[in-house]
Regions:
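Short, charged low-complexity linker/loop segments at the C-terminal edge of domains
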Residues: 171-175, 256-262
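Short strand-edge motifs at loop-to-beta-strand transitions and within beta-strands
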Residues: 218-223
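Edge beta-strands of extracellular beta-sandwich domains
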Residues: 242-256, 264
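Compositionally biased low-complexity segments at domain edges in trafficked proteins
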Residues: 263-295, 300
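Compact, charge-rich alpha-helical regulatory domains located at protein termini
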Residues: 286-356
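Repeat-associated, polar segments at repeat-unit boundaries in modular proteins
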Residues: 351-369
């Protein structure tokens, strides 16, 4: 709305008036268009992006950044939020989005750091978050009241594997870190062993027998590492030139059957899909939200709703009620059409309270597909 833009311009002017030496910035949500006037108010700009968690794939971050930079070479671009959840008790040999495994979180941050390192035009990147933190309305990954996007657990006692990919990029002291150490029980004859390190080369041994040496940078992967039944000692050593400069060992136990506790059963069928919007699952004070077959709900995409005449009318009505005077451009609708309505609600945060979510879902339930 005009009032929003006037307010942002006023805040930007006030910041410069208070301190002319400091640059101003602003954090945009993903759905703010590349050519939005919002990107031309402050000195520099940042975006909150969760490709690879709430929507899309982690690999989608790179083309988005390059497209924005190509279209706006004069804008100094940063990432003000990015991250995904990882719970140290959950594990997978084939990690996927929404399995909440420590392995998927580590993979996500591997790809993000790789993306950032290849794009020196970024003025900043801000990982969300260093530590797991309290969030009383959340219920994700089998954990109530907590956001699990931290690189370190809530009690500050456990550094997740994702912590060590940052250490590999940033520290100068030589180290090796064998990943998936809490994924201790394995039912497979062979496993993949991944090591994070800032060394030039990493050598791997199992029960004292050398498996291989790999030269690389930050991420060292050893495939088809054999395990015998019972305990196996996995040892990784880091080298600078020909000299071994660090090493560590962890136990892995070969078992007959997979450990079911490593998998979040209620989310197992949804693994590989984007994370749900915790805000839009219904509040405890009322009946659960309904998702009748053949009718719309907040789980449907905006684009599908706009193709339905009744749905398009409802969208127009809601925009008028919730954002009076705000003009929604075709470009914004085109971008939003790929999101579920749940995702749009999540982006809006506390501007859309639970009772409004319930009302919206009830209205959608009356529209036949």
């Amino acid at each position: 709305s005009d009032a929003l833009f006037e307010n942002l311009h006023a805040l930007n002017d006030l910041a410069h008036e208070l301190d002319k030496t400091r640059l101003t910035t602003m954090a945009n949500l993903s759905m703010v268009e590349n050519d939005s006037p919002l990107n031309h108010i402050t000195d520099v700009i940042s975006y909150n992006h969760y490709f690879g968690w709430y929507l899309g794939k982690v690999e989608d971050n790179a083309p988005w950044l390059d497209t924005f930079h190509a279209e706006n070479p004069e804008i100094c671009l940063g990432i003000s939020e990015y991250g995904c959840e990882g719970i140290p008790t959950l594990h997978s040999a084939s990690p996927k989005v929404r399995d909440y495994s420590e392995e998927y979180q580590a993979y996500y941050h591997e790809k993000m750091l790789e993306t950032f390192a290849q794009r020196p035009y970024l003025w900043s990147t801000h990982v969300w978050n260093m530590f797991d933190f309290a969030s009383d309305m959340r219920d994700e990954g089998g954990v109530q009241g907590r956001n699990n996007k931290g690189l370190v657990t809530f009690d500050r006692q456990t550094r997740k594997d994702s912590f060590y990919i940052y250490k590999a990029y940033w520290t100068k002291a030589p180290f090796v870190h064998i990943c998936s150490r809490r994924f201790k029980e394995r039912a497979e004859e062979t496993v993949q062993v991944k090591v994070y390190s800032n060394c030039e080369q990493v050598s791997l041994k199992v029960n004292g027998k050398k498996i291989d040496s790999v030269a690389g940078k930050y991420v060292f992967t050893f495939d088809r590492v054999p395990l015998t039944m019972g305990e196996n000692i996995i040892q990784a050593a880091g080298f600078l030139g020909q000299q071994e400069v660090c090493c560590e060992s962890i136990p892995l136990v070969r078992v007959a059957e997979p450990n079911a506790s490593y998998v979040l059963q209620e989310e197992a069928e949804k693994a590989g899909q984007n994370a749900k919007n915790w805000f839009a699952t219904g509040d405890e004070a009322g009946e659960p939200l309904q998702f009748p077959e053949g009718y719309f709900s907040i789980r449907d995409k905006v684009g599908a709703l706009l193709k339905n005449p009744e749905g398009e009318k409802l969208v127009s009505e809601l925009v008028d009620q919730m954002m009076p005077g705000m003009k929604i451009s075709k470009g914004m609708l085109n971008m939003a059409k790929h999101f579920t309505i749940e995702k749009v609600i999540e982006m809006a945060g506390d501007r859309i309270p639970p009772e409004m979510v319930r009302y919206l879902n009830q209205r959608l339930n009356q529209i036949q597909k």
